Regions:
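Conserved donor nucleotide-binding strand/loop of the catalytic core
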Residues: 50-54, 65-99, 137
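A conserved acidic beta->alpha catalytic loop
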Residues: 54-65, 112-113
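Cell-envelope/extracellular polymer assembly enzymes that use nucleotide-activated donors
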Residues: 12-14, 52
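Acceptor/aglycone-binding surface of glycosyltransferases and processive sugar-polymer synthases
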Residues: 83-85, 89-99, 104, 116-187
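Donor nucleotide-sugar binding loop of glycosyltransferases
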Residues: 22-25, 60, 115
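Short, well-formed alpha-helical segments that are part of the catalytic scaffolds
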Residues: 22-44
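Short, Lys/Arg-enriched N-terminal segments with co-localized hydrophobic residues
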Residues: 1-7
Length: 187
């Protein structure tokens, strides 16, 4: 386990982006997230924040790694990690968390199902409410086939019944965490 406490950078948000075959989506995501950070730099409560993007290529076969490398050429705030094969989203997220140096760390999908526009609101909730983490959940399944929505709801209900955990329907990996929370996850 890589411990980054000594290297933590105050007022920095690290964005961990696990990617598997996201060659087409990654440039769109990058444009959107940089737009959000540019907007945040104009607002008084977030003006001093900087960011780093940590793109974790989970063994993609479509050129995702080439796109990630290209992004690092023009933006020193972008880093990438490359896996030799597909180890799964959780392994990619964990590797990204291990390399994140920000005082705050977010996990976001590159396919824009996690709206980057929510990041300022999530940051505000983290700061004003004193939370260690702010998570998201999907409230609507518009555009998804009815049969998939049906089985997703059934899955969450069943898992809540057979486990001691309350499984929230539509819970997402998209979250913003403070350093204390991230370090606890990694320990």
């Amino acid at each position: 386990i890589i411990c980054r406490v000594a290297g933590m950078e105050k007022n920095k948000i690290s964005i961990v982006v696990p990617c598997f075959n996201e060659k087409e989506a990654l440039p769109l995501f990058y444009n959107k997230i940089t737009q959000v950070f540019n907007q945040m730099s104009q607002e008084s409560e977030t003006a001093g924040l900087s960011y780093e993007l940590i793109i974790v290529d989970d063994g993609s076969m479509d050129g995702t790694l080439d796109v990630a490398k290209e992004l690092t050429v023009n933006d020193s705030g972008v880093k990438y990690i490359s896996f030799s094969r597909n180890f799964g989203k959780e392994a990619a997220m964990y590797a990204g968390l291990q390399h994140a140096v920000g005082e705050y760390v977010a996990i976001m999908d590159a396919d824009l199902q996690d709206p980057p526009d929510m990041l300022p609101e999530m940051y505000k909730a983290l700061m004003e409410e004193g939370y260690d983490a702010v998570g998201t959940r999907r409230v609507t399944r518009k555009g998804e086939p009815a049969i998939r929505s049906f089985f997703a709801r059934k899955f969450y209900r069943l898992m809540s019944r057979i486990s001691k955990a309350n499984m929230v329907d539509g819970a997402r990996d998209y979250r913003l965490m403070n350093r204390k929370y991230v370090d606890a996850l990694l320990s």
